[in-house]
Regions:
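Core SAM-dependent methyltransferase catalytic element
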Residues: 196, 202-226
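A short glycine-rich, Lys/Arg-flanked "PGG" loop and its adjoining helix->strand segment in the class I
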Residues: 125-140
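Hydrophobic beta-strand segment of the Class I
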Residues: 14, 112-113
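N-terminal, positively charged/glycine-rich alpha-helical extensions of SAM-dependent methyltransferases
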Residues: 1-15, 161-162, 172
Length: 226
C-alpha cells in the first residue's frame, strides 16, 4: 500500500487516526512544536503534508490571525477535507502538491513545518532540498515526527501498542491496511541522530532536536543561512 492510497482511505477520519496512533497526545506534541517555533505577527509559514490544517490553525491562533499559512499536501482528499473543515478561515491557502516539487518561488516562507508527514515522503532528501529552497534566508525548518524510544521498558510497551494500532484501524475505518502501513513507516524512520545528519546534508545550519516522551516523538529544527 502506498501513502496516497492510505490517505484516500483515512482522510475524513485523519484527526481521529492521530488520536489512535498517539493516544491523544499529538495535541500536546503539536503545541510543543509551535512553542519552539516562536511564531511572530506577520510570519508566513508553509505547512507541508498539512492534512486537515491542524498545525496551521495552531500557528494562526498564536499570532491572533495576523499571519499567513499555506497548507500543502499531495493528497486531494486531504486538501478537500481540510478546506471543508476550515472554510471560514481566510488566512489559510490550500495547495495540492508533493513535498518533492513545491510550486513556490525561492525564499517564499519564514518557516517550513511538517508534522507526522516526513516519513511518508517519497524522497526525503529531495523534499528537504525543496524545504531549503522555499525558505527565506534565516528561515526555519521544523519537523515533528515519531522517532526512536530511548527508554527500554517504554520501548517494549510502545512496541506492543504499535501492534494493536491496526486492530483499532479496522474498527475506526473498517480497514487495517492503512494502519499497518503507517506503523511500518514509523519503524523504518531514521533515528534522531541519523535524521539530524540528513537535514544537515540539505545545507541546514544549527540543526538540533528535542525528544518528547522519551523519544516516542522528536522535534527537529534547522536554519537556512547564507
Amino acid at each position: 500500500m502506498k501513502a496516497q492510497e492510505v490517505f484516500n482511505i483515512v482522510a475524513n477520519k485523519y484527526d481521529l487516526m492521530n488520536d489512535v496512533m498517539s493516544v491523544g497526545t499529538h495535541r500536546y506534541w503539536k503545541e510543543c512544536m509551535i512553542d519552539w517555533l516562536e511564531p511572530f505577527v506577520g510570519m508566513k509559514i508553509i505547512d507541508v503534508a498539512g492534512g486537515t490544517g491542524d498545525i496551521s490553525l495552531r500557528f494562526l491562533k498564536r499570532v491572533n490571525g495576523e499571519g499567513e499559512a499555506v497548507v500543502c499536501d499531495p493528497n486531494d482528499s486531504m486538501i478537500e477535507y481540510g478546506k471543508k473543515k476550515n472554510s471560514s478561515n481566510q488566512n489559510i491557502k490550500w495547495v495540492t502538491a508533493p513535498a518533492e516539487s513545491l510550486p513556490f518561488e525561492n525564499e517564499s516562507f519564514d518557516a517550513y513545518l511538517v508534522s507526522f508527514g516526513v516519513r511518508n515522503f517519497d524522497n526525503i532528501k529531495k523534499a528537504l532540498d525543496e524545504a531549503h529552497r522555499v525558505l527565506k534566508i534565516d528561515g526555519r525548518f521544523i519537523c515533528l515526527e515519531f522517532s526512536k524510544v530511548q527508554n527500554r521498558e517504554l520501548s517494549k510497551l510502545y512496541s506492543v501498542y504499535s501492534k494493536m494500532i491496526p486492530i483499532f484501524g479496522k474498527i475506526i475505518v473498517g480497514d487495517e491496511k492503512p494502519y499497518k502501513y503507517l506503523t511500518r513507516t514509523i519503524e523504518n524512520f531514521p533515528s534522531q541522530e541519523r535524521f539530524k545528519r540528513i537535514i544537515e546534508e540539505s545545507n541546514f545550519s544549527n540543526v538540533e532536536f528535542r525528544n518528547l516522551f522519551n523519544g516516542v516523538v522528536a522535534i527537529h529544527t534547522g536554519w537556512k543561512k547564507i
